Structure formats: C-alpha cells, structure tokens
C-alpha cells in the first residue's frame, strides 16, 4: 500500500513516500520513507536561512550613509550595526560627560526616551572625553549613568566627537549638519530616513519646546 505524507517545503502538497521508498530500495538505498520527510525539512530550513541572509544584506545595502557604522555598547564586547538596529527610527544622538555642568541633562534625555520610545524615538548616548570632562573608564561611566540617573537608553563606547579628531560616525553627522559638537551634550536629531534634520547646542535642554516639537513632527 502506498502512503502519502505532506512535504514541508511545499505546504499543502502531498508526496507519495511509499513510492519514493520503493524507488529508493530498487536502487539499493534501503531507506525508510520518513528520511525523505527529514530531507525536505532540512531543505526548507536551508532556504529560510538563505532568504534571511539575503534580506539582511539587502537591508544593509539600502542603509542610510549616516547609519552605516558599527558601534560597541558601553563597557561591553557586544557591537551593533546602527542601520540594522535603528533604521526607521527617529534618533537623538548625544555626546555625554559625567563632570559637566550639563550632566543633569541625562535625566531629561531619559524622560524623552521613556515618553516617545514606543512612538519610534531612540536616544543614543556617546560618552566623550574630548572636552576633558569624562575621564572615567567605561565601567565607571555605565555605573554612574545607571545609579545616578537610571539611564535606560542605549549608551555606546567612549567616542571622539570634536572636529579635529572626530569619529567617522560623528564626521558624517557633522558633514550633513555643518555643525560639530563644541561641548558636551550636543544633540543631533535624525529622521526615519537617517538624515540629520536638526542640530542643537549644549544649552538646549531635552525638554526644550523646539526640540520636542521637531521630534514629534518626525515621529
């Protein structure tokens, strides 16, 4: 009697595995019919994996140039490609420091993040010692941000941001905005397409009406 079983790589179709088994035996391949089912399942997994890789490569190929960078998380060995992680989000990119008169802005930045994150806003913090106010190790910076301001938004490796020695990511932001950070807590706002739509100096607080209005208009 010939039995039929569904083929996983072709949902809804039926393959006569009894026939497959008899043909296999006739060629000296004494295999049980379920071997065919397993083979088809493995083929399906392979096709899915290949498709995911192709989609991922295509997404990177379409990545906005301002986000085409890989950055390491603060005090971590884990890195992330900014485009893969944050493409399609509105981004507020801020260079931070622990010993600055503007350090209290951490609290406002976290409030912004919590208020608008579900709508698509991401705040990205980049500690920098370019202005000699972040001498701490990355471990100490992370501890300070967590214990003092309960920072939950993503924080990244210590980064050069000033014009003369700026990190390539900050060079890209400055080239489009025409404005390099002159002090700690400079803010770049990027739209969902990865374009810099606004640049704010250190004195512009996270609860500034103009900043909030521009964020909301881009969400």
Task: Describe each PLM feature range.
Residues 47-51:
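Hydrophobic helical h-region of N-terminal Sec-dependent signal peptides
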Residues 69-90, 113:
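A short beta-strand-turn-helix
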Residues 85-101, 123-126:
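Short active-site neighborhood of thiol/selenol oxidoreductases, capturing the structured segment around
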Residues 102-166:
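Structural microenvironment flanking redox-active thiols in thiol-disulfide oxidoreductases
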Residues 52-69:
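N-proximal helix/coil linker or "cap" segments that precede and/or mark the start of modular domains
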Residues 177, 182-219:
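Thiol-/selenol-based redox modules, centered on thioredoxin-like
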Residues 9, 20, 25, 29-46:
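Bacterial N-terminal signal peptides that target proteins for export
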């Amino acid at each position: 009697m010939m039995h039929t079983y569904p083929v996983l790589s072709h949902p809804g179709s039926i393959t006569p595995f009894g026939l497959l088994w008899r043909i296999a035996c006739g060629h000296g391949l004494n295999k049980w019919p379920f071997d065919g089912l397993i083979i088809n399942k493995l083929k399906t997994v392979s096709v899915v994996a290949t498709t995911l890789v192709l989609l991922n490569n295509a997404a990177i190929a379409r990545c906005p140039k301002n986000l085409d960078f890989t950055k390491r998380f603060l005090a971590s060995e884990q890195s992330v490609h900014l485009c893969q992680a944050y493409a399609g989000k509105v981004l507020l990119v801020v260079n931070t420091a622990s010993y600055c008169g503007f350090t209290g802005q951490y609290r406002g930045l976290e409030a912004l993040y919590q208020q608008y994150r579900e709508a698509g806003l991401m705040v990205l913090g980049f500690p920098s010692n370019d202005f000699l106010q972040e001498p701490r190790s990355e471990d100490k910076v992370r501890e300070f941000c967590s214990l003092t301001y309960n920072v939950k938004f993503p924080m990244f490796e210590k980064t050069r941001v000033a014009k003369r020695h700026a990190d390539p990511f900050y060079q890209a932001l400055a080239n489009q905005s025409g404005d390099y950070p002159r002090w700690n807590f400079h803010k770049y706002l990027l739209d969902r397409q990865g374009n810099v739509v606004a640049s704010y100096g250190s004195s512009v607080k996270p609860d500034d009406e103009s900043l909030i209005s521009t964020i909301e208009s881009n969400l």
